[in-house]
Amino acid sequence: MIALIQRVSRASVVVDNQTIGAIDKGLLVLLGVEQEDTREKMEKLATKVMSYRVFSDENGKMNLNLEQVGGSLLVVSQFTLAADTGRGLRPSFSGAGTPDQALALYEEFVAFCRAKGVTTETGQFGADMQVSLVNDGPVTFNLQV
């Protein structure tokens, strides 16, 4: 399972010209599910995302996590993160999870974060989405479990 996280001052996702999810300070999480992913991996990754210290403390050091800064999550499914780009000029998605598997783990990821008390907005699984963000830093990390 892959989470590309970006520290943002704001982010939103639009489907069919309607904003369906938006946050201010927090993390935009682009979430990719791979074939071998499980609920255990999802919980490990969600915990890491929520606990990852990517926000600056009073000394300007990345030392604070999402909860410590009162931040939110915007979680957007993105199967292209599971692409194999090692050969040729076209990505292969053979390692990506099936749509049913990916939807289940995406929904469980969101529910897990919400159950931990984190304000969590979402995109729409499988939809054509327009994602807007102001990357704060820029700060972007690729987390995998």
From Swiss-Prot:
One GO MF annotation is: D-tyrosyl-tRNA(Tyr) deacylase activity
User: What's the gene?
Assistant: dtd
Q: Which reaction does it catalyse?
A: glycyl-tRNA(Ala) + H2O = tRNA(Ala) + glycine + H(+); a D-aminoacyl-tRNA + H2O = a tRNA + a D-alpha-amino acid + H(+)
SUPFAM superfamilies the UniProt entry points to: DTD-like
Q: Which Pfam families match?
A: Tyr_Deacylase
Q: Where is this motif: Gly-cisPro motif, important for rejection of L-amino acids?
A: 137-138
- Keywords assigned: Cytoplasm, Hydrolase, RNA-binding, tRNA-binding
Quote the protein name from its UniProt record.
D-aminoacyl-tRNA deacylase
Q: How does it assemble?
A: Homodimer.
Q: Which family does it belong to?
A: Belongs to the DTD family.
Mind telling me which InterPro entries this protein's record contains?
Daa-tRNA_deacyls_DTD, DTD-like_sf
* Function according to Swiss-Prot or TrEMBL: An aminoacyl-tRNA editing enzyme that deacylates mischarged D-aminoacyl-tRNAs. Also deacylates mischarged glycyl-tRNA(Ala), protecting cells against glycine mischarging by AlaRS. Acts via tRNA-based rather than protein-based catalysis; rejects L-amino acids rather than detecting D-amino acids in the active site. By recycling D-aminoacyl-tRNA to D-amino acids and free tRNA molecules, this enzyme counteracts the toxicity associated with the formation of D-aminoacyl-tRNA entities in vivo and helps enforce protein L-homochirality.
Would you tell me the Gene Ontology cellular component terms? cytoplasm
HAMAP family of this UniProt entry?
A: Deacylase_Dtd (MF_00518)
Annotated EC: 3.1.1.96
Give the comment on domains. Answer: A Gly-cisPro motif from one monomer fits into the active site of the other monomer to allow specific chiral rejection of L-amino acids.
Q: What class of enzyme is it?
A: hydrolase
CDD domains the record matches: Dtyr_deacylase
Instruction: Indicate where this protein resides in the cell.
Output: Cytoplasm
One GO term of the biological process aspect: D-amino acid catabolic process
Source taxonomy: Bacteria, Pseudomonadati, Pseudomonadota, Gammaproteobacteria, Alteromonadales
